[in-house]
Swiss-Prot record:
Residue(s) carrying Phosphoserine: S326
Keyword line: Cell membrane, Cell projection, Cytoplasmic vesicle, Disulfide bond, Endosome, Glycoprotein, Ion channel, Ion transport, Isopeptide bond, Membrane, Phosphoprotein, Potassium, Potassium channel, Potassium transport, Synapse, Transmembrane, Transmembrane helix, Transport, Ubl conjugation
Name of the coding gene: KCNK1
Site description Important for increased permeability to Na(+) when K(+) levels are subphysiological, residues in chain: T118
Lipid bilayer topology: Multi-pass membrane protein
Pfam families: Ion_trans_2
Region annotated Important for intracellular retention in recycling endosomes, chain positions: 293-299
Descriptive protein name: Potassium channel subfamily K member 1
Residue spans crossing the bilayer: 21-41, 133-156, 182-202, 244-267
């Protein structure tokens, strides 16, 4: 008997705090996923980093031995200055000195990466005035960009997602949930083809040092707003029509970001995903509780009004009776 009562009480406790339990498992799963990613990246990339470090040490030692007139300290200073300039997007190589980082097309590309929070990091402001303006520009521009993207995605979703699903549901009588799932999958495949596979093939042709995997990697890193900056298009030597190429990349990134958000919004509107998300949310107050609160307020208000009316009646009863002129006129002829 006690075991059954304890079991039922535990079940009721779990059901009552189901959202909190689900949220706790969500946090734990996210932390485990972070640790899993760290373990995989470390095990895969650490050997390559070690090989690169050994290769650089050998190359540096060989260079110092071949150039005895140059001390190791002077070489360190030179390399430090070169790496510092490279962090600002300025390369010391002769074949890269012709590309300017702050012409109009490059500045437009930089502004788009700042507002979309992609931030490749290959080009950064050099002056203090540029850094200050970048802060002010981002503070105003990022919320403006979010507002712009929200409005565009809402309008596109109506025409691309909601109306087609409603048309097939009303016109052909298909189940709305089934139509929504099929539509979301097809829209995702079309978006991946148009904004990942096709652009990756184009970049692998236009960029001399990129293969298809590296081009696809750039497309994904850019449209997901990760923006690592290890691959940036239009930075090659003697890039043809570089300004037009940069403007085209800016348009591609903006349209691709909108397409990604439309696909995410389409999947988020699926009934199954809505039910799944609600498992981790804090439950809202039930309508019955709100009705009880309103009824309680009404009862308290009515009790106050009744008390006020009772006080007025008592006050009238305690006052002395005074005949009004109308009552006197009314009683006069009768008595006469």
């Amino acid at each position: 008997m006690l075991q059954s009562l304890a079991g039922s009480s535990c079940v009721r406790l779990v059901e009552r705090h189901r959202s909190a339990w689900c949220f706790g498992f969500l946090v734990l799963g996210y932390l485990l996923y972070l640790v899993f990613g760290a373990v995989v990246f470390s095990s895969v990339e650490l050997p390559y980093e070690d090989l690169l470090r050994q290769e650089l040490r050998k190359l540096k030692r060989r260079f110092v031995e071949e150039h005895e007139c140059l001390s190791e300290q002077q070489l360190e200073q030179f390399l430090g200055r070169v790496l510092e300039a490279n962090n600002y997007g300025v390369s010391v190589r002769s074949n890269a000195s012709g590309n300017w980082n702050w012409d109009f097309a490059s500045a437009l590309f930089f502004a788009s990466t700042v507002l979309s929070t992609t931030g490749y990091g290959h080009t950064v402001p050099l002056s203090d005035g540029g850094k200050a303006f970048c802060i002010i520009y981002s503070v105003i521009g990022i919320p403006f960009t979010l507002l712009f993207l929200t409005a565009v995605v809402q309008r596109v979703t109506v025409h691309v997602t909601r109306r087609p699903v409603l048309y097939f549901h009303v016109r052909w009588g298909f189940s709305k949930q089934v139509v929504a799932i099929v539509h979301a999958v097809l829209l995702g495949l079309i978006t991946v083809s148009c904004f990942f596979f096709i652009p990756a093939a184009v970049f692998s042709v236009l960029e001399d040092d990129w293969n298809f995997l590296e081009s696809f990697y750039f497309c994904f890193i850019s449209l997901s707003t990760i923006g690592l900056g290890d691959y940036v298009p239009g930075e090659g030597y003697n890039q043809k029509f570089r300004e037009l190429y940069k403007i085209g990349i800016t348009c591609y990134l903006l349209l691709g970001l909108i397409a990604m958000l439309v696909v995410l919004e389409t999947f988020c509107e699926l009934h199954e995903l809505k039910k799944f998300r609600k498992m981790f949310y804090v439950k809202k107050d039930k309508d019955e509780d709100q009705v009880h609160i309103i009824e309680h307020d009404q009862l308290s208000f009515s009790s106050i009004t009744e008390q006020a009316a009772g006080m007025k009646e008592d006050q009238k009863q305690n006052e002395p009776f005074v005949a009004t002129p109308s009552s006197a006129c009314a009683d006069g002829p009768a008595n006469h």
